[in-house]
From Swiss-Prot:
<dbReference type="InterPro" id="IPR001405">
    <property type="entry name" value="UPF0758"/>
</dbReference>
<dbReference type="InterPro" id="IPR025657">
    <property type="entry name" value="RadC_JAB"/>
</dbReference>
<dbReference type="Pfam" id="PF20582">
    <property type="entry name" value="UPF0758_N"/>
</dbReference>
<keyword id="KW-0645">Protease</keyword>
<dbReference type="InterPro" id="IPR010994">
    <property type="entry name" value="RuvA_2-like"/>
</dbReference>
<keyword id="KW-0479">Metal-binding</keyword>
<comment type="similarity">
    <text>Belongs to the UPF0758 family.</text>
</comment>
<feature type="domain" description="MPN">
    <location>
        <begin position="102"/>
        <end position="224"/>
    </location>
</feature>
<feature type="binding site">
    <location>
        <position position="175"/>
    </location>
    <ligand>
        <name>Zn(2+)</name>
    </ligand>
</feature>
<dbReference type="InterPro" id="IPR046778">
    <property type="entry name" value="UPF0758_N"/>
</dbReference>
<dbReference type="InterPro" id="IPR020891">
    <property type="entry name" value="UPF0758_CS"/>
</dbReference>
<dbReference type="Pfam" id="PF04002">
    <property type="entry name" value="RadC"/>
</dbReference>
<dbReference type="GO" id="GO:0006508">
    <property type="term" value="P:proteolysis"/>
</dbReference>
<dbReference type="GO" id="GO:0008237">
    <property type="term" value="F:metallopeptidase activity"/>
</dbReference>
<keyword id="KW-0862">Zinc</keyword>
<keyword id="KW-0378">Hydrolase</keyword>
<dbReference type="GO" id="GO:0046872">
    <property type="term" value="F:metal ion binding"/>
</dbReference>
Amino acid sequence: MAIKDWPEGEGPRDKLLVKGAAHLSDAELLAVLLRNGLSGLNAVDLARSLIQEFGGLRSLLCAPKHQVCRLPGVGPVKYAQLQAAAELARRVAQENLQRGQVLTNPDLTRDYLMRQLADRSYEVFAILLLDSQHRVIQFVELFRGTIDSASVYPREVVSLVLEKKAAAVIVCHNHPSGIAEPSQADRRITERLKNALATIDVSLLDHMVVGDREIVSFAERGWIN
């Protein structure tokens, strides 16, 4: 049944305006973005099928264009709408972890890194630069590709830290497999970076590995002394 034929106030847009966005299901929220469906499939049904196809909202919003646009009812325009929504969410997270903010809440850092790095189809190694009071200076993506001990260069990390006058850092990278468990290579990289940063009296506070649903902290495991 077309949404226009639903009882008054039951359509996702009307429900959002009356009750607020928090009262909508994932499919209903997505339907508001999609605006319309296709023949025999209303926007909510289309949204539900997309979520099922990709296994969740996050995977859908992180999927490449060719994977999304190959599905019936989703062309470049709808893909652009979805990407705009995803980018807005990332920018909200960026504002939540803005320059000058003191990192006193580990959950805030985890949420930010999850939004930035989870579900990337490639590995990203990044660094969160902090001042002596552990206030945020900048978040920088340093390396992309296969992250191993040969592809992460401590001298580049040290150079950036000196340039930004950071006093402490948190490094992080994602596992495209979705499994956050650190590898032996991750532990070797961490040790090399810690030793390199120690030569300029900068503290490595943590190395966080981002998976699909969790983040593993080296500091919490006692791997950074």
